[in-house]
Every structure is written in structure tokens, then in C-alpha cells.
């Protein structure tokens, strides 16, 4: 199934995010993992918990997307070192879902670490920048790695981020053709700046997860 929206708001200053905003993540330099201050008070309230991994080239907006989803914030971010870990609780179709989100680094030097993060993932969101064609071409490599190494039941979603920026280089029709080759992947164009389609993207992922694991 393909879900695309051609409207969105995004900006690209100071890494993947622009404008103001707070950064509440604390880094563990030894492990290369950033643990979000967002936490859950009572894990027993969740009916289902799932691991989700964010993949894609650096500066495509992975961290901005996760920050918008988890904290409803948008602002400048530093490049992720290794991976960042966040938790988001959602109620979808009257089911309490806990998403354990691994936001992976997009730099080439961290590429060898990536399989460690997406192994055991129930879902993956691969992000590209609609104004940079090369990030969509690289997305195909991420998808290929997932197909080889991840669970065959993995829920795959593609996110075309920064949709309001000028000079679009990746057309929706091109993405839809690629998705038709993949089969049942989810696709949304998103805006971390405005929040457009962020909740919709993850809600659809949760629905697929519920269907897969009910």
C-alpha cells in the first residue's frame, strides 16, 4: 500500500533541522548510544511493544522526525553518533503500543554498526530527502540490506522528508514505481518542521504491526 502526500513543511538549517528547539538527549560516549529523557511510567500499561529502526543518509531528517514524533519538537540537531534510543507510546485502534525507536547514524563510518540496531526490529522507516536524488538512490541500498538481514515479517516504510523545500529532485511517481517493486511498503512524504504526516506515518506502521502480531 502506498500513501503519499505532496504537501508539507520543512526546513534545513543546522544539520537536518532548522530554527530553534531544545535538545534533551544525553550521550553515552562509550556506547555510542543517545538515550532520550522520554520514558514510560508503567510498562505494564502497554498491550504491545515493538522495536523500530530509522535508517537513511545523514541530514535526511531522521532525528528530526523522531524528535517531532516523541516530543513534538523541531530544532537544530547534532549528527547522531552510533544510534539514539527513544520510546513513544501510541494508542491505535484502542490498543496501547510502545515503539522502541532506534535512530541510527547515517554517516558511512557507522555503516558497519547498523545491522546491530536493526536485527530484531519489527518495523523500519527508511528516510530520504526529496530535494536530494542521491539520498533516494542510497535508500535502495538500505532497503536491500533489510531484505537480506531483517525479519521477513518486517514492516517497511519509506519517508520522503523536507517536502516544502524548493528544487524537488525525487518525484512521487518515481517512488511509487519503486514501491510497486517492493510490494506492501508504506510510503508518506513528511515534514519534520510542521509535523505533517509524522503521526500518520507511525499510526499506519502501528496498524500493520497489530495486524502482523495479533
From Swiss-Prot:
A GO cellular-component term linked to this record: lipid droplet
Protein name from the UniProt record: Putative ras-related protein Rab-5B
Motif annotated as Effector region, chain positions: 77-85
Gene3D superfamilies (alphabetical): P-loop containing nucleotide triphosphate hydrolases (3.40.50.300)
A molecular function (GO) term: GTPase activity
Keywords, ordered alphabetically: GTP-binding, Nucleotide-binding
Recorded family membership: Belongs to the small GTPase superfamily. Rab family.
Gene: rab5B
InterPro entries linked to this entry: P-loop_NTPase, Small_GTP-bd, Small_GTPase
The species this protein was found in: Dictyostelium discoideum
GO process terms (BP): hypotonic response; intracellular protein transport
Origin: domain of life: Eukaryota
PANTHER family per UniProt: PTHR47978
PTMs per UniProt: This sequence lacks the C-terminal cysteine motifs subject to isoprenylation in other Rab proteins.
Binding annotation for GTP: 56-63, 103-107, 161-164
Amino acid at each position: 500500500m502506498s500513501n503519499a502526500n505532496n504537501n508539507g513543511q520543512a526546513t534545513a538549517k543546522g544539520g537536518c533541522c532548522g530554527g530553534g528547539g531544545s535538545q534533551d538527549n544525553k550521550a553515552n560516549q562509550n556506547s555510542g548510544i543517545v538515550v532520550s529523557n522520554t520514558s514510560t511510567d508503567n510498562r505494564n500499561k502497554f498491550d504491545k511493544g515493538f522495536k523500530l529502526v530509522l535508517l537513511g543518509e545523514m541530514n535526511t531528517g531522521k532525528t528530526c522526525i523522531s524528535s517531532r514524533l516523541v516530543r513534538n519538537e523541531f530544532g537544530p540537531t547534532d549528527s547522531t553518533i552510533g544510534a539514539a534510543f527513544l520510546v513513544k507510546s501510541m494508542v491505535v485502534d484502542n490498543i496501547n503500543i510502545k515503539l522502541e525507536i532506534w535512530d541510527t547514524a547515517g554517516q558511512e563510518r557507522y555503516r558497519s554498526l547498523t545491522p546491530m540496531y536493526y536485527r530484531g526490529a519489527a518495523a523500519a522507516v527508511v528516510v530520504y530527502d526529496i530535494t536530494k536524488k542521491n539520498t533516494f538512490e542510497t535508500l535502495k541500498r538500505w532497503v536491500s540490506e533489510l531484505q537480506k538481514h531483517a525479519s521477513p515479517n518486517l514492516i517497511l516504510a519509506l519517508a520522503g522528508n523536507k517536502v516544502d523545500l524548493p528544487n524537488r529532485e525525487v518525484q512521487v511517481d518515481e517512488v511509487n514505481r519503486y514501491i510497486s517493486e517492493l510490494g506492501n511498503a508504506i510510503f508518506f512524504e513528511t515534514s519534520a518542521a510542521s509535523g505533517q504526516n509524522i503521526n500518520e506515518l507511525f499510526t499506519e506502521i502501528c496498524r500493520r504491526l497489530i495486524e502482523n502480531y495479533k
